[in-house]
A protein has these predicted regions:
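Bacterial N-terminal signal peptides
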Residues: 2-10
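Bacterial Sec-dependent signal peptides at the C-terminal "C-region" and cleavage site
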Residues: 11-23
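Accessory carbohydrate-recognition regions in carbohydrate-active enzymes
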Residues: 20-145
Length: 145
């Protein structure tokens, strides 16, 4: 019994861990805009798997088309919210918009919306950015542990 135990300990102690190999960053292949058009009901914003926050732009909120509150073809951002449902086909969560504004707004009910250019919009897993035209602001959203 002692010999078996000694042999087992010798074998265990002589084992070396496998060499660490370089890990490839597969997030470079992710296109977070997939599903943001044609009723895919997904959003490109920043989120972490199983995280409590899914921060993303809102480009509309009326009707079934805007279940995720983002449609790729839109040219106006209404604001940014902290919770989104992805691919559900229904709206929920009662989001509160956050939007940078400057100056006095004559019509507060819609004056907070801003145009943005698709060539100045980008997203990767955990990161979203867009440059707003009015006010001239670069919005950046991130998610991390």
């Amino acid at each position: 019994m002692a010999a078996t135990l000694a042999a087992g300990l010798f074998f265990y102690s002589s084992c070396t861990p496998a060499e660490k190999t370089d890990t490839k960053d597969y997030t470079q292949y992710v296109n977070t805009f997939i599903g943001g058009a044609d009723n895919g009901h997904t959003f490109p914003g920043a989120c972490y798997p199983f995280g409590m926050i899914q921060t993303s732009p809102v480009t509309g909120a009326v009707g079934w088309r805007y279940c995720s509150e983002y449609v790729y073809e839109d040219s106006l951002i209404w604001g940014f919210t902290q919770t989104h449902l992805n691919g559900t086909g229904c709206m929920d969560l009662g989001d509160i918009l956050v939007m940078p504004v400057t100056g006095t707004r004559a019509r507060a009910w819609d004056a907070y919306r801003s145009h943005f250019s698709k060539d100045k919009e980008a997203a990767t897993p955990g990161y979203y950015t867009a440059e707003l035209s009015d006010p001239q602001v670069k919005a950046e959203l991130t998610a991390s542990i």
